Structures are given as structure tokens and as C-alpha cells.
């Protein structure tokens, strides 16, 4: 996963993961790859697939519309939730290539399709190459309403 550096407000990315689930206290942790980084399929479609694989979303009906509705509820204020950037998902390009690591600057105000996006740079320790990337931050969501 990633290690948080509080003094720099950055995430040092150690490796990539597409999802991590925490069953305690009804908290779900999910990270979604940016659609543009991995092909033609969009963010919501990828998120729907991710949730379906873990049994959170049943996959019936129109995935995109249902997931948009879920996101709107989570960010709309009707449901109390706690959001923290606790992990990072590098795009498929970085994940498939050894030697890459990254530092992502958390920008909580940046919203893409209703999901916080993290912008950062990646560095290849093998050849010194740098590359910019956009990531969707991991969300730590408490869905328990109050």
C-alpha cells in the first residue's frame, strides 16, 4: 500500500493495489483505477466491477447509473461518512513495470466524476525517468447514517 508522510502531506507509494476491504465497523476501503489510464472503460464501470467482485454491488440493472447514485449519496451529505486518503492505486502502466515508485500530492478539492482525484508524479528507480499521473484516491467510507 502506501505510507503517509504527515509533514509533507504526501503519500509515498510502495506498490499498487486495486482494492482493499476492511470489514470492521461497516467501513469499506476501495481504490479505483482512472479509466483513462487503463483503456476505454470509464471510472464508474471499473468501480462497479470492483464492487461486484467483492460482493458489495450486485451488478444488476444499469451499473453506471446505480454507482453514480451511490457516489452522490456518499458525497451529498445525507449519509454520514468519513473519507480519508489511506492508500493509492497506481495505473496499470506503473503496476506492470518494476522499479516504479511515486509520490502523490493529496488534493482533496479536486473532484473528477464525483470522486476525489490525486495528482502526482512517478519515478523509475531503474532509469531515472519521471512520469506524471492522475489517481483516484482511496476512499475510507463509513456508511453508517446518523
Q: Predicted segment positions?
A:
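Conserved active-site-adjacent core of cysteine acyl-enzyme catalytic domains
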Residues: 48-137
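Cys-His-centered catalytic/binding microenvironment captured across papain-like cysteine peptidases
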Residues: 1-6, 14, 120-146
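Generic hydrophobic/packing signal
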Residues: 24-29, 33, 81, 125, ...
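Active-site-adjacent structural segments surrounding the nucleophilic cysteine of cysteine proteases
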Residues: 1-54
Amino acid at each position: 500500500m502506501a505510507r503517509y508522510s504527515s509533514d509533507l502531506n504526501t503519500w509515498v507509494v510502495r506498490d499498487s493495489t486495486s482494492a482493499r476491504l476492511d470489514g470492521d465497523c461497516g467501513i469499506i476501503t476501495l481504490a479505483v483505477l482512472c479509466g483513462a489510464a487503463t483503456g476505454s472503460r470509464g471510472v464508474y464501470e471499473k468501480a462497479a466491477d470492483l464492487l461486484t467482485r467483492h460482493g458489495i454491488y450486485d451488478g444488476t440493472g444499469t451499473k453506471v447509473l446505480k454507482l453514480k447514485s451511490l457516489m452522490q449519496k456518499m458525497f451529498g451529505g445525507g449519509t454520514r461518512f468519513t473519507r480519508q486518503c489511506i492508500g493509492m492505486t497506481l495505473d496499470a502502466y506503473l503496476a506492470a513495470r518494476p522499479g516504479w515508485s511515486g509520490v502523490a500530492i493529496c488534493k482533496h478539492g479536486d473532484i473528477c466524476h464525483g470522486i476525489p482525484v490525486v495528482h502526482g508524479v512517478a519515478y523509475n528507480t531503474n532509469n531515472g525517468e519521471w512520469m506524471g499521473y492522475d489517481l483516484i484516491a482511496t476512499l475510507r467510507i463509513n456508511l453508517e447514517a446518523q
